[in-house]
C-alpha cells in the first residue's frame, strides 16, 4: 500500500537522545490525528528486545520484532515514530523524516540532567557532532522527505511543531 492509499501520513522524528524527539512527537500527536509511537516504550511493553544492556542502560532491540509489530500500523498510516534511528523503516511507508539537531554543549547538559553515564553522554555527543542520525536519514530516504530542524530553544521547538502541523495539513489536502 503506497502513501496515496493512506488517509494519514507516517512521520519519523529522529535524532540523538536529548534532542527533543519525544517532546515534539507528543506535541504533534496532540495537534494532529496522528498516533505517537515511542519505540523505546513499545520495545519495553511488548518485549521486542533480546535483553537489557547493563553497560549502556538500554534494551538490545530486536529490530525484526519491531518491524513486525509496526508494519500493520504503518500500512494504515497516521503514525509518528519517535526513535533515535530511522534506517530500519521502509521508504514506501514513510512520508516525512524529521531529524532534530542540538548544539553539543546543550545536548551534554540535557543528557547529564537525565543521569546518563559520562561514557553514554560522550558517545551520544559524538554522534550528534558527527551527524550520525542526519546521515542515516539522508542515506535511507529520498532527500526530499528529510528535514533537519534545530531543537535548542522553546522558540525553535514551537516553530518545529508549527511546521510539522502545517505539513500534515498540506499532506492531507494532497492525498
Swiss-Prot record:
Q: Which gene encodes it?
A: fap7
Organism this protein belongs to: Schizosaccharomyces pombe (strain 972 / ATCC 24843) (Fission yeast)
**Gene3D superfamilies this protein is in?**
P-loop containing nucleotide triphosphate hydrolases (3.40.50.300)
The reaction(s) annotated as catalysed by this protein in its Swiss-Prot or TrEMBL entry are: AMP + ATP = 2 ADP; ATP + H2O = ADP + phosphate + H(+)
**Transmembrane segment boundaries:** none
Describe its partners and assembly state.
Answer: Interacts with small ribosomal subunit protein uS11. Not a structural component of 43S pre-ribosomes, but transiently interacts with them by binding to uS11.
Q: Where does the source fall among the domains of life? A: Eukaryota
**Which family does the record assign?**
Belongs to the adenylate kinase family. AK6 subfamily.
The name on file for this protein is Adenylate kinase isoenzyme 6 homolog
Pfam families, per the entry: AAA_18 (PF13238)
Q: What is its EC number?
A: 2.7.4.3
The GO terms this record gives for MF are:
adenylate kinase activity; ATP binding; ATP hydrolysis activity; protein carrier chaperone
Which cellular compartments is it found in? Cytoplasm; Nucleus
- Record keywords, A-Z: ATP-binding, Cytoplasm, Kinase, Nucleotide-binding, Nucleus, Ribosome biogenesis, rRNA processing, Transferase
Region entry NMPbind, spans: 38-61
Gene Ontology annotations for the cellular component aspect, listed alphabetically:
cytoplasm; cytosol; nucleus
Annotated GO biological processes are: ribosomal small subunit assembly; rRNA processing
Purpose: Broad-specificity nucleoside monophosphate (NMP) kinase that catalyzes the reversible transfer of the terminal phosphate group between nucleoside triphosphates and monophosphates. Also has ATPase activity. Involved in the late cytoplasmic maturation steps of the 40S ribosomal particles, specifically 18S rRNA maturation. While NMP activity is not required for ribosome maturation, ATPase activity is. Associates transiently with small ribosomal subunit protein uS11. ATP hydrolysis breaks the interaction with uS11.
Q: Where is this region: LID?
A: 113-123
| Residues annotated for ATP binding in this entry | 18, 20-23, 114
Question: Keyword Kinase: yes or no?
Answer: yes
